[in-house]
Amino acid sequence: YEIMPSLVGSEMCIRDSICTLKNLILKYVYNKPLLDADELFEKCMEYKEKIAPFVCDTHTYIQNALKEGKEILLEGQLGTLKDPDFGIYPMVTSSPTLAGYGCVGAGIPANQIKDIVCVTKAYSSAVGAGEFVSEILDEEEAQQLRIHGGDKGEFGATTGRPRRVGWFDCVATRYGVECQGATQVVMTALDCLSYLEEIKVCVGYELDGEVIDYFPTTPKLKRCKPVFKTFKGWHCDIRGIRDYDKLPQETRDYVEFIESKIGFPITMVSNGPEREAIIHKIK
């Protein structure tokens, strides 16, 4: 994260001065052995064949694609609340996570972005510390959602560490899609809630005795308590259904209530991990 803005990074090309700069840092900052330019060159040549097909003048490549009318898809890794400016600072990442920054990273003019799709699960989850208003604090209840959640449960893919889980948060989600400038929302993992007889949705925050429906700054967020609305669960297996209208009424009520609270159209939902499990709500 630091190398490029510090102006000490290396581009995908050979520069005679690259070792000179790096060696100054190694010698006077880290007191480490210096790099040998010839050895480094040989090592880079080993990697060249693997990465060469993916290196090009991306500006020209993208501009030509736009002129030819091709569709370009940009995918962000993290959500709004991990953004260093608009997220729950300091529990954020080090680079922007908003859709607008996709233009910067890819070199696409901002006026060329026509559709911004925000993806949210049908419940909430989090990794690591930080404010989590709708978190399920009862460990037994949380563990049940972890087991049923995700593709292989809500556990770290590498460490196996249990993730924090909670009910869907309309306040945080509305804030998130507003910051992203969403044109549509996709709700995934509806099937993960099928075991529940009742499902809660966080519809507001209680802050110092007052109920609010906006997402506050981090110091205030620390004092917020969730305000829940309880829904009757569908309590049946909904996997395999491919038509939105054939989902249980309780499932549709859940989706459409959330849609009304966040103020953005939910155009697709999913009821399983497969590609085929994407259901178009709005055709």
Which sequence ranges carry the predicted segments?
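Conserved active-site and cofactor/substrate-binding residues in soluble primary-metabolism enzymes
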Residues: 16, 35, 39, 53-60, ...
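General beta-strand structural signal in soluble alpha/beta enzymes
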Residues: 51-56, 73-75, 82-83, 112, ...
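Short acidic, glycine/serine/threonine-rich loops at helix termini
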Residues: 83-87, 93-94, 127-132, 197-201, ...
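Short, basic, glycine/proline-bearing loop/turn elements
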Residues: 38-50, 154-159, 231-244
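A charged, amphipathic alpha-helical module
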Residues: 19-80
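Single conserved hydrophobic/aromatic residue that forms the stacking wall/gate
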Residues: 1-9, 14
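Internal helix-turn-beta structural module
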Residues: 200, 210-283
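A glycine- and small/hydrophobic-rich beta-loop-beta segment
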Residues: 102-230, 238
